[in-house]
């Protein structure tokens, strides 16, 4: 695992470490005097205690000048910018690192370094490193490899990677090469380039060690050694830059990052051979180690980040490389004060963009170390040989990673607070908290297991029909993007023996209790120290690389109210019994694939927009996408009303609406109407009329006159009764019509509706003032009767034609003579009221244009009669007419045959679309007929204008069609739109465009555009 950089060491701790060494007065003189005497090359007079508070306290001492005098042949060409040190500081490092070589084995030795004391074993066999609790650094273990035949390589050089002397002899390189060949599978992808500057690299170290030791050596070896049984604080983990530097210097061909640690006997043999060695207090040794490590840390430029490979590698427990006596499980530990995931990612050679971990199928956090391996069993962890492991910073894989392949399961990072205490003493102090910590650890492990078993990536368990909690979706953890996750940190002081066993506990725990305990305990354990390390333990970081899930292991129950660590996706089970593809759909819909500015990971996501808005029972929770057959069956059972029967192709949607919307209560007057009997395009804005308005205006059919007269008489006689009956009784007559299997045409539908609903003129007189005041109703119901004068939209033409016919002795001012096509006549008062209620601004092109404006105005005023007071009925009729004209739904037809009736005309033009009104008027003077047809849609009207002339018979004159009632689109003086009109005014005083008809204007406008 890549360690932290030098910035992880806090200035306060550095200051205390260094001042601890300076204040040591066991030699009889002050620490500053001793240090100045021991290190004549450095001028420390310019430093005082205040200088140690800043990170640049050694900046003036020139530990790492940019321009180095060292020979470039020592380094490989790729490492030219790495650690460089001049000869002056090289002497200091050589003096400091050689001092511990003379420490006797039985007095201090590796006891000063608990990391080595428990990580090193007497075994010198290179093929037996045990499963380590922390994956050791490749460069560190390469330095810790057996070097019993090399006396020059000191113990501290192995610990601190003195880069001024990278290799002591060719034997060390040979050992490293041997390790490279034995563990090729352990090395991630790096170019195998062997550096052949062995003798050149050896020379600087020999030169630095040839310098005589100063008084510092005598001072450090003149004190009584501390007993070995008392372990000091673990030595600091070497900086990642130094590790990477040594890794590249010693040999880039070495693919083995895990050689066996050096045995204590080999390392301490040199110490026992020194007769002048004396006991050294553990505080001095600790301070010395910290000081040297501090100096080495500052020797590396900050801008250079190492490139470390981090791909998980297969590690089998049966491999000979993993079998070592238990004491070699522990290696030097990293104890940085603040853990940074970004630092971890940058320190590794990840084949992806680590700045966007949320774009990965598997989170990079799950593979922070390429050496994820099995935690040792509980009984072996509790052995006395591993007592000091309680001080370590562990990054361990979850309990199930026992296979030979890499484990991408979430990692748990644990750090111990009191790193300066001996391991045994700490274990004695923590015995009271073992049980509590063990329970928390078991909860964490089960949460890990629960997170690993989430579906969505093709795991075998998804094919077994397992269900997961549908209300939680894993969210990636990032303190930079999610401030709420900052305090979610866990510290455990639990000894290693108290950890849970490898297998997941068989009893099922409540997930809410687990997550609550985890978050509450982790927040309660926050320390005032600056060292807070996030626990990398989450379902979102569970891997998809482990496919050996045990189906017998229980899964925690679902949790209804997840915290910020979970993301609510859906309230139904998204993966009840779905296949891999459907599960992947849910995963892709999660936040892992979204950028943070779009959907922050801590913000709950909305429901699936494509999910049906139906509430399922607990047994009917299904995924919103791709429902299974049993899902459809379950859903259709309670909500049958949402599933309409399949319509026959010949039945229109309008009939279905009529069939299902016939149960409106009487008291719902003024509410929105679910449908319109007139099949309007604006059904949503129609209102429900009271029962008094039940027999509302609908389209009249072209059925025989006798039928209409009978219906009229029957409806007129039973009006008081029908107004009190529910609407469903009146609409039940519509049911036989849609049940008919033969294809129904629009005119047949309208005929059937007209037959059963009819039109009561007497009821309309009462309705207009009571129910037609609503603007929604006024602008929508354009479904008045077809052929009679009282139901006409555009009776202005009738008025003008009536005026013309009055001059000729024909009484058409009240109603045009339409006995051949009008089944029944309305009372004269009603017809007169409806006639004069129409606005003259909507006149068709057949109006008498020869009249002067004054004459026309006078006739309008006279013809309005009793309706000139502007009643709501008149306003309503005017509004409906203007709306139809403005939408271009009115077609004016000239030159009709003498025997043409409105019913026949309507039947012919129904081929273009639904007709709201059809009216035929007669001109007695010329014996010609003209008609108006109002379509439901303007598109149908336009189609009829273009192709209506083809509907005539052979013995009939040709039709002349144009849009009617478009006076507001024309000039004050206008001519008939019909180019063959005989009544057009002379165009002498008009411009070119005023004299042109509409079609000509349209063609010219189109030509001008091209």
From Swiss-Prot:
The keyword Cell membrane does not apply. Gene3D superfamilies: 3.30.70.330. Coiled coil: none annotated. Residues 1-91 are annotated as: Abolishes DNA transcriptional activity when missing. Residues 178-189, 264-279, 369-384, 619-638, 659-670 have a biased composition (Polar residues). SMART domains: RRM. Residues 429-449, 795-811 have a biased composition (Acidic residues). One of its GO terms (biological process) is positive regulation of cold-induced thermogenesis. It holds the Pfam family RRM_1. A motif (HCFC1-binding-motif (HBM)) lies at residues 681-684. Residues 411-428, 604-618 have a biased composition (Basic and acidic residues). The modification Phosphoserine is found at residues 145, 148, 383, 628. Keywords: Activator, Nucleus, Phosphoprotein, Repeat, RNA-binding, Transcription, Transcription regulation. Plays a role of stimulator of transcription factors and nuclear receptors activities. Activates transcriptional activity of estrogen receptor alpha, nuclear respiratory factor 1 (NRF1) and glucocorticoid receptor in the presence of glucocorticoids. May play a role in constitutive non-adrenergic-mediated mitochondrial biogenesis as suggested by increased basal oxygen consumption and mitochondrial number when overexpressed. May be part of the pathways regulating the elevation of gluconeogenesis, beta-oxidation of fatty acids and ketogenesis during fasting. Contains 3 Leu-Xaa-Xaa-Leu-Leu (LXXLL) motif, which are usually required for the association with nuclear receptors. This is Peroxisome proliferator-activated receptor gamma coactivator 1-beta. It comes from Rattus norvegicus. The gene is Ppargc1b.
